């Protein structure tokens, strides 16, 4: 009996070759293990995008994974650039591979922000390959003698030719030519299969991807498609039969694999951040002191759980010099040479040459920060916690990580940028006293182990939110400070979803554009294609039974879902390393100018325990910053009890204001951070928040974890005294007491597993990671035996054990960290306080911070008007570029004590460039405009922009009637090239019919997205048939199950994954918001109307639960009388 030869596949592409491979990396590794290959080399085109995913699967399978890439190389062979597979033999070779891939994308000698290239233009010159050949093995799938000779000169014995047999015409001649060149030049020849799929069944999808890549269809692709399915993974036996005339080719492949000993595990946890160094004496004022110190609040309010709202600190009299990065000038990007020491040794650096670095610096900053936070020496329990955390940070070597985040936060505050740390970092007392986070974890009783632990063996993760409009300043600071070769943003892999998959597959299969559009419109962006059945196809005029291509489109689109389409930028993850980052992971330009990204996403980095810093943008911080700035300029009278003494610091907002909680309790929360959704508004009257911790609960409870775990209703019943507080296991009471026996937070789930099931902290954290990982229900269910056995040992069995497991299983959706909820609750309170006491400034700030939040500008304006704010429209004579506050006199700032009026800014005019708006403001600064002609002449307005302003009703007193203004604007003619100096000779007066109120409102919405004249529903209500159709306000007075009809403008549509197909629609009318509940059967009957109509007429019954009122819908129809506003709903899936 003969044995199959050893064989390793050395040339394999995955779907991360972007439209060149039709299998996931995990599928290729799994199949290679099944086939008994001795090793597998993943060599995607110009990238290492999928290598970490393959590595994780290879570890599970016990299969050696060779790291490689297939580079497009210019100048290797005559004619067009050639393909060359490079395989890493050792760590040096891996670094060289990463550098070459980076060079291919970024070009030669890049130091600034390189320009992004199209994928087919990415290439590297052979001279660069030859110069970086050390530690790399080159595999050339060609036979050109000159190219082979050049490879041998550059790589020596680390070069080979690759041959393949795919049963196509002409390939035997290429195989013979390669073998001949190999013999002549002394270069080995290895058998490969140029793998594109893990199974032959994927060949149809491979053809589709080829068509997408070339912008053609399967009917027209011709020779661009592979003629068969032979480019799939094959086992040693099959290849031995195929290459029975050349067994040494298989042996050569196995030998090459044996030479490539580098594994991705070698870079696990590698590359600490560069140490931050501060000169002695520079710490005076180095930890910025808040205008209102948290210690003051502590002395006044003693040991309460309510944190200070300290997000922005005032600056010292003189801004301290920026700390240096070890090994470089403070102002330059230079860093220590590659190979400089790191790890715990670098992190524990001590004083030298009069400077502080590493743990010495961190300890000093913590001492200063603790005195700042607590107004002197910290309480004993805080001091103990700080000592414990510092000891662990030192032992794990993470001092530079904390110092780097501190440095970035320090920079932001020096520029007046509002910021706050959140997530698990809020569990850390060190982060709190460094000013990174705003939650006192000792007072809140938060679990430090959720953030970092010795047993877990993974790096900490600090997330910091910055004003989203100013985050770019922070990002560019990081690039400038550390250098682009040592800092890069984490990528996000944008994958095919339902619509995008349908569109690309449909086009490739030759469906008409009309068919593709109708098919794609059937589903939401994230909807499961498996739900597309005959009824939906019939709605689109498509019949799967009669169209084989429609059936294939659906089937192939389902296969394509989850494949990568392109890379985007992660919301804020930064990788910063001491040695060049491009020796650890390739870097490439992002689509956004000025940014570079690494080729791995956050999960890849986590798999390898590589540190990242998350610098995130948060719209609410922008809005809060803008609101405080408005208050600083338009401060109320000093006697006002709601005046902000120091409007540049949230720390000065009065805490625990009953009026704020009362407002939130009646669901008056449009625009308020995190609690403005329909679900949160439904919760608020039942929760009735009375203190800060109630806001923490509110933030966390409307999440998939608590919802799927069935925890919301038990908590509310216990809170109302309708259900007895009970604990399935008595020792759990200290863990669950604050949430009335119901686990709501990840930290509680971890403690529960330790106490009730005997898990170690490390096992509990593994449980936490399983619970919060997508699609992890199966993994969590597999742990049930371990959980149940541990609970049984402690006398927990039967119903109690099932209850605990059910609650834990709910967290597989998404359990919220308590620290994260507490950080967000700070912003809930701050935004609610501003809405309650300064609604004009708050609404103005929200308008100026768009896009953000849950509602479109027109809803924010309507809400402001319901709160007594006067809103004035866009006017070239009064408006700034942004919305602003003015007094009773149009265009004049509000005087102290005067009620502020909200003036909509020129930015609201759709399509108007900022440069045009600023030209108007610059001209107006010299004096008011006396006429339209003067406006045109002084602001150098073109006819197009003047017409745009006239259509928006923005010419104000210059032309009060909109139609007349448009007519006159069309008469503007050019004078002297691009200077539009005035009006044409007068034409006969034209008597234009007056616009109706409905026409005016429609024009407002069409041009600015909002109207200050009135709500569209107020205009059409008289034609709706008397009192039959109720207003949103009237719904609150109707009894439960009363039949009702409501109508309104659709402002939000939601179809949450946790709602089992239920759709929630919010309708706005002139009195408020009505919430519709559309059950799945009703949704299927009225899908096009629900998804597409801007105004709805809904019939159904009132559903009351306490003060919460919804309408359960029986039928819906478009509102025929509604004006054509062009208003856009915010749709969330």
Swiss-Prot record:
Say if the entry is tagged with keyword Transcription regulation.
no
What broad class of enzyme is this? transferase
Location comes to:
Cytoplasm
Q: Which reaction does it catalyse?
A: DNA(n) + a 2'-deoxyribonucleoside 5'-triphosphate = DNA(n+1) + diphosphate
| InterPro entries hit by this protein | DNA_pol3_alpha_NTPase_dom (IPR011708), DNA_pol3_alpha_thumb_dom (IPR041931), DNA_pol3_finger (IPR040982), DnaE2 (IPR023073), DnaE2/DnaE/PolC (IPR004805), DNAPol_HHH (IPR029460), NA-bd_OB_tRNA (IPR004365), PHP_dom (IPR004013)
Q: Which GO terms describe its biological process?
A: DNA repair; DNA replication
Q: What EC number is given for this enzyme? A: 2.7.7.7
Q: Give this protein's Gene Ontology molecular function annotations.
A: 3'-5' exonuclease activity; DNA-directed DNA polymerase activity; nucleic acid binding
Q: What superkingdom does the record give?
A: Bacteria
Nucleotidyltransferase listed as a keyword? yes
Q: Which controlled-vocabulary keywords does the entry list?
A: Cytoplasm, DNA damage, DNA repair, DNA replication, DNA-directed DNA polymerase, Nucleotidyltransferase, Transferase
Return the GO cellular component terms, semicolon-separated: cytoplasm
Q: Give the stretches traversing the membrane.
A: none
What is the similarity comment for this entry? Belongs to the DNA polymerase type-C family. DnaE2 subfamily.
Question: What is this protein's function?
Answer: DNA polymerase involved in damage-induced mutagenesis and translesion synthesis (TLS). It is not the major replicative DNA polymerase.
State the protein's name: Error-prone DNA polymerase
Species name: Anaeromyxobacter sp. (strain K)
């Amino acid at each position: 009996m003969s044995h199959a030869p050893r064989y390793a596949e050395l040339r394999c592409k995955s779907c991360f070759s972007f439209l060149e491979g039709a299998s996931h990396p995990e599928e290729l590794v799994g199949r290679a293990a099944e086939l008994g290959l001795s090793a597998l080399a993943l060599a995607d085109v110009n990238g290492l995008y999928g290598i970490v995913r393959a590595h994780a699967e290879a570890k599970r399978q016990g299969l050696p994974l060779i790291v490689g890439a297939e580079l497009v190389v210019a100048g290797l062979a005559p004619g067009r650039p050639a393909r060359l597979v490079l395989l890493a033999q050792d760590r040096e070779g891996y670094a060289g591979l990463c550098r070459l891939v980076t060079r291919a994308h970024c070009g030669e000698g890049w130091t600034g922000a390189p320009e992004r290239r199209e994928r087919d233009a990415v290439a590297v010159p052979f001279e660069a390959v030859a110069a970086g050949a050390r530690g790399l093995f080159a595999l050339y799938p060609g036979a050109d003698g000159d190219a082979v000779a050049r490879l041998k000169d550059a790589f020596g014995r680390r070069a080979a030719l690759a041959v393949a047999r795919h049963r196509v015409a002409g390939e035997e001649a290429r195989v013979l030519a390669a073998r001949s060149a190999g013999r002549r030049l002394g270069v080995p020849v290895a058998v490969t299969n140029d793998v594109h799929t893990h199974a032959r069944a994927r060949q149809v999808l491979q053809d589709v991807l080829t068509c997408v890549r070339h912008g053609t269809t399967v009917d027209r692709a011709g020779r661009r498609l592979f003629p068969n399915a032979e480019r799939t993974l094959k086992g040693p036996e099959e290849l031995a039969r195929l290459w029975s005339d050349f067994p040494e080719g298989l042996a050569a492949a196995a030998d090459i694999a044996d030479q490539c000993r580098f594994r991705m595990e070698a870079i696990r946890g590698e590359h600490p951040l560069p140490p931050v160094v501060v000169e002695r004496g520079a710490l005076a004022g180095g930890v910025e002191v808040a205008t209102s110190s948290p210690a003051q609040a502590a002395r006044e309010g003693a040991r309460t759980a309510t944190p200070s709202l300290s997000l922005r600190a005032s600056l010292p009299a003189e801004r301290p010099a920026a700390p240096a990065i070890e090994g470089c000038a403070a102002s330059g990007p230079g860093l220590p040479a590659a190979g400089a020491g790191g790890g715990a040794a670098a992190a524990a650096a001590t004083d030298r040459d009069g400077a502080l670095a590493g743990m010495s610096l961190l300890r000093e900053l913590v001492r200063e920060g603790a005195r700042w936070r607590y107004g002197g020496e910290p309480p004993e329990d805080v001091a103990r916690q700080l000592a414990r955390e510092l000891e662990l940070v030192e032992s794990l070597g993470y001092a530079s990580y904390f110092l780097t985040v501190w440095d970035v936060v320090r920079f932001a505050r020096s520029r007046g940028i509002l910021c706050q740390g959140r997530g698990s970092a809020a569990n850390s007392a060190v982060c709190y006293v460094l000013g990174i986070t705003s939650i006192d974890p000792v007072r809140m009783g938060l679990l430090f182990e959720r953030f970092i632990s010795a047993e877990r063996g993974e790096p900490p993760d600090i997330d910091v939110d910055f004003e989203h409009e100013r985050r770019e300043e922070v990002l560019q600071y990081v690039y400038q400070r550390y250098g682009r070769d040592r800092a890069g943003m984490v990528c996000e892999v944008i994958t095919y979803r339902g619509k995008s998959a349908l569109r690309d597959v449909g086009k490739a299969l030759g469906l008409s554009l009309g068919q593709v559009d109708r098919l794609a419109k059937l589903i939401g962006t994230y909807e499961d294609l498996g739900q597309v059945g005959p009824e939906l196809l019939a709605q689109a005029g498509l019949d799967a039974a009669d169209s084989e291509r429609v059936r294939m489109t659906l089937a192939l689109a389902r296969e394509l879902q989850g494949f990568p389409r392109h890379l985007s930028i992660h919301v804020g993850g930064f990788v910063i390393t001491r040695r060049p980052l491009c020796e650890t992971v390739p870097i490439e330009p992002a689509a956004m100018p000025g940014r570079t990204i690494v080729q791995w996403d956050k999960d890849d980095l986590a798999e390898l325990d590589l540190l990242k810093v998350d610098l995130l943008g948060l719209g609410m911080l922008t809005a809060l910053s803008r609101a405080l700035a408005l208050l600083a300029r338009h401060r109320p009278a000093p006697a006002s009890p709601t005046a902000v003494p120091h409007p540049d610091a949230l720390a000065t907002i009065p805490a625990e204001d009953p009026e704020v909680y009362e407002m939130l309790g009646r669901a008056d929360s449009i625009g308020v951070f995190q609690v403005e959704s329909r679900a949160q508004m439904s919760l608020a009257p039942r929760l009735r928040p009375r203190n800060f911790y109630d806001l923490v609960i509110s933030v966390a409870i409307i999440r998939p974890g608590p919802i799927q775990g069935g925890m919301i209703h038990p908590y509310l019943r216990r809170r109302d005294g309708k259900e007895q507080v009970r604990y399935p296991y008595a020792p759990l009471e200290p863990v669950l007491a604050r949430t009335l026996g119901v686990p709501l937070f990840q930290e509680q789930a971890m403690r529960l597993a330790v106490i009730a099931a005997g898990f170690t902290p490390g096992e509990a954290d593994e449980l936490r990671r399983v619970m919060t990982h997508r699609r992890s229900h199966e993994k969590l269910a597999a742990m049930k035996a371990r959980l149940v056995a541990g609970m049984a040992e402690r006398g927990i069995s039967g119903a109690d054990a099932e209850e605990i497991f059910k609650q834990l299983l709910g967290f597989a959706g998404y359990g919220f960290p308590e620290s994260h909820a507490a950080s967000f609750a700070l912003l809930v309170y701050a935004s609610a306080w501003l809405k309650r006491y300064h609604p004009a400034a708050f609404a103005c700030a929200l308008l100026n911070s768009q896009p953000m939040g849950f509602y479109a500008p027109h809803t924010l304006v309507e809400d402001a008007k319901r709160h007594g704010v006067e809103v004035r429209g866009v006017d070239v004579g009064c408006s700034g570029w942004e919305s602003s506050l003015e007094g009773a006199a149009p265009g004049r700032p509000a005087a102290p004590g005067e009620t502020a009026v909200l003036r909509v800014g020129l930015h609201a005019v759709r399509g108007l460039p900022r440069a045009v708006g600023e030209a108007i403001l610059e001209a107006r600064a010299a004096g008011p405009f006396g006429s339209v002609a003067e406006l045109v002449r002084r602001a150098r307005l073109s006819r197009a922009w003047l017409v745009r302003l006239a259509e928006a009703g923005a010419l104000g007193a210059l032309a009060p009637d909109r139609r007349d203004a448009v007519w006159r604007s069309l008469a503007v003619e050019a004078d002297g090239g691009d200077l539009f100096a005035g009006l044409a000779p007068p034409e006969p007066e034209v008597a234009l019919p007056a616009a109706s109120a409905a026409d005016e409102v429609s024009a407002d919405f069409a041009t600015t997205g909002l109207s200050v004249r009135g709500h569209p529903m107020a205009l059409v209500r008289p034609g709706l048939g008397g009192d039959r159709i109720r207003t949103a306000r009237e719904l609150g007075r109707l009894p439960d199950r009363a039949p009702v009809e409501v109508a309104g403008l659709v402002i939000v549509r939601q179809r949450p994954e946790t709602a089992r197909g239920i759709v929630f629609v919010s309708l706005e009318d002139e009195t408020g918001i009505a919430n519709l509940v559309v059950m799945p059967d009703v949704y299927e009957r009225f899908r096009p109307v629900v998804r597409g109509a801007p105004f709805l007429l809904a019939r159904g019954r009132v559903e009351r639960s306490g003060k919460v009122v919804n309408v359960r819908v029986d039928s819906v129809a478009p509102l025929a009388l509604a004006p054509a506003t062009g208003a856009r709903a915010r749709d969330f899936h």
